[in-house]
Curated annotation (Swiss-Prot):
Cofactor: Zn(2+)
Top-level class of the enzyme under EC nomenclature: ligase
GO biological process entries: methionyl-tRNA aminoacylation
Record-annotated tRNA-binding domain positions: 586-692
Superkingdom as given in the UniProt entry: Bacteria
Protein name: Methionine--tRNA ligase
Gene Ontology cellular-component terms listed: cytosol
UniProt-annotated binding residues for Zn(2+): 143, 146, 156, 159
E.C. no: 6.1.1.10
Amino acid sequence: MSRTLFVTTALPYANGSFHIGHIMEYIQADIWVRSMRMAGHTVHFVGADDAHGAPIMLKAEKEGITPQALVARYAAERPRYLDGFHIRFDHWHSTDTPENVALSQEIYRALKSEGLIETRSIEQFYDPVKGMFLADRYIKGECPRCHAKDQYGDSCEVCGAVYAPTELINPYSALTGAAPVLKSSDHFFFKLSDPRCVEFLQQWTTGANRQGVKHLQAEVQAKTREWLVGDDGEAKLGDWDISRDAPYFGIEIPDAPGKYFYVWLDAPVGYLASLKSYCAAKGLDFDALLDPAGPTEQVHFIGKDIIYFHALFWPAMLKFAGRKTPDQLNVHGFITVSGEKMSKSRGTGISPLRYLEIGMDAEWLRYYMAAKLNARVEDMDFNPEDFVARVNSDLVGKYVNIASRAAAFITRHFDGELAYDGDTDALAAEFAQQAESIRAAFEAREYNRAVREIMAHADRINQAFDAAQPWVMAKGIGAADAATRARLQDICSRALAGFKALSVMLAPVLPALASRVARELFGANADFAWGDAQQLPQRVAPFKHLMQRVDPKLLDDLFEPPAAEASAPAALPGGEALADTITIDDFAKIDLRIARIVNCEEVEGSTKLLRLTLDVGEGRHRNVFSGIKSAYQPQDLVGKLTVLVANLAPRKMKFGVSEGMVLAASHADEKAEPGIYVLEPWPGAQPGMRVR
């Protein structure tokens, strides 16, 4: 029976770029969403930037820009990461939007009408140097529970305790280091200690959704019980301060001038705001979709560091605002490197953008993460040697190897026609059973189990193929009898049918590769669905290279270099000092344009030059000579985009006239650091566009 699901990931804070932890969570959710869609379910998968709060306000202030400009800068980066790792959200939004303002204020008013909002005068820390009330994250001190030092003002990263900033021991301002002073201020509290909230949360945290799946994993349920019930068996939930004083970048509380919602109130509402924006764009009924009595399942993927907000505050807010409560909270751990916490200072930090920029295949990482992730709240360890071994052995050595070997025989001897000797019902039934087992593992988020089973199937296919030795039969196939030909065709057809079934099973993990297999190799006009595993293919196209092996040397470039010692002299960028400062007017004199390399050829008599024919959108072609012969083969440059100094005076050379200069980078000491790198714009740029 088809289901409707509303799926989210935790909102990234919009004061920085995505880190590898974000990408892990998005890949985990994306695999789940793709698998559910392959099963025929309707999934609305949305995300958003968490765009409010003091950190954004203060960072923008430091940079001399508005908070909105800061948020927009990071929002503009998001597609590069998401597209790069084949993460396909239906919609990406922001909490700094009219939808989120309206929904946050509606929920607040509903809670207030239920008698769950209370105004209290509190003493709040104030930084006398900065001249502002301090948000929780800008107060540090000793945890009142476990006495760990340098903990934030709202929660302890060591023991997980949640507390009021005034409970910290020896607090200090994280902005100025000054000892904060206490000032009185009226604040608004969500009465989480109300017996109605306590009773609901005790039921919800131990309950299950209509599929029979628990709302919370066992480890998460145990943790919430610690927060819900004291040693004496009595409820111990504290009320939640949901307000902050101006100056603050956020959503104003209705009828309370100078008061704003704490970011953790409006941030999760951003899930709903993103869906509402998506529904408006697609003509869907948002209210009907999230009707508390309706069939839609609400599923959140989050990290283990934000359980408290999602397992207690969020469900209670929704429940008593008359809205749908979450059906499932999927919590994951952190990423470690070779068993240790990632650290830039130790050179074990992984930048997702660096991963893409050095040419590593996004689907290598998707596969590796799938092979390590499960439904428990466990950290995922990235081990470089294990990464290389798994990708090269599993994906290339086992999976891709099946198609590369079997398709060659079918193409060469049978013109791409597949044929099976005998009854194929058992084979189709076997694939269907295997696919259902894998589908169930993905739905249960036991990705590592799914990957193990898939590779076990690949092993069996390879073993059967090797045992049959089709290469021996193929040697004399031209003079072979019909039975031998049929036997060879059957062996290869069954191997390719198995490869197709494996591709269906891997499609949630390797969406780009599986799409190529479906469309290019087997001639399908759509991507795989789970039911395609049991449909035996009848034709195969000539095999094309599917996946490159991992070069272990790439891993040397992947990790962010360790921070330099403070005493070490600063290295010159690119081996040379920066040029003297110029004005914007000086720069404006240079007309840089996007150019397409229409043709490229060697220059007879020159050991350094290549002759480039460039289209700069002028209606004619330009001739440019460039000293890049040592770094590029002419055929590799044809069709590429590059950057041209378009208003450089033509230069008459021995070999002709050069009408501009193509930009390329190199180190000042070319002997010590050889290499020339022609600038290439991102896809989407067009010839003639000016570089500003």
